[in-house]
């Protein structure tokens, strides 16, 4: 679990949000089924140290303090939304979701692809259609990643959502026939195979014609 410190944000509004960003802080909000929205702020320098280790499925221990440094509350939350500047890609706002025990939640879990497909050795290439898998689960049963082994995939082979192995109690929200991973056949391979087939078929047609003339 990642630990993150935040301060209560007393003043709200766009002007205050801009001021915070100029001062090296990121405005955020904490909310949930049983939680009234709590505006907070986080030091950008603190956020940058852990940001690369956090996904939507990562439980975060959020320690909320007042401006005097006194701890107001500690919550287990999940990073639900990241807003970035359209030009600089800088993080400008965060949404943290606090689930309620016994209340199932929807969350995106990173897909971890392991192995090298047989089809890639033959000239194909691996296409991952879903980097994250949307699931429904209990808050205390959130998988950190969903692993899929692609070693046995040959040219044209597909792994569907129904093929994913999920922990008990975790439900995939993709349709059963949704393609998750596939080994695609390069166009040049298809063209070569088609050309060879045409060349093989042509003499047969000529021979049949000669036989008919005889």
UniProtKB/Swiss-Prot annotation:
Biased composition (Basic and acidic residues): 204-214
GO CC annotation, single: cytosolic large ribosomal subunit
Domain of life: Bacteria
Keyword tags: Ribonucleoprotein, Ribosomal protein, RNA-binding, rRNA-binding
Gene Ontology biological-process entries: translation
Family matches, as SUPFAM superfamilies: Ribosomal protein L25-like
Region: Disordered, residue numbers: 194-214
Parts of the chain that traverse the membrane: none
InterPro entries: Rbsml_bL25/Gln-tRNA_synth_N (IPR020056), Ribosomal_bL25/Gln-tRNA_synth (IPR011035), Ribosomal_bL25_b-dom (IPR020057), Ribosomal_bL25_C (IPR037121), Ribosomal_bL25_long (IPR001021), Ribosomal_L25_dom (IPR029751), Ribosomal_uL5_bac-type (IPR020930)
MF terms in GO: 5S rRNA binding; structural constituent of ribosome
Assigned protein family: Belongs to the bacterial ribosomal protein bL25 family. CTC subfamily.
Function of the protein: This is one of the proteins that binds to the 5S RNA in the ribosome where it forms part of the central protuberance.
Subunit record text: Part of the 50S ribosomal subunit; part of the 5S rRNA/L5/L18/L25 subcomplex. Contacts the 5S rRNA. Binds to the 5S rRNA independently of L5 and L18.
Protein name: Large ribosomal subunit protein bL25
Species, as recorded: Thermotoga petrophila (strain ATCC BAA-488 / DSM 13995 / JCM 10881 / RKU-1)
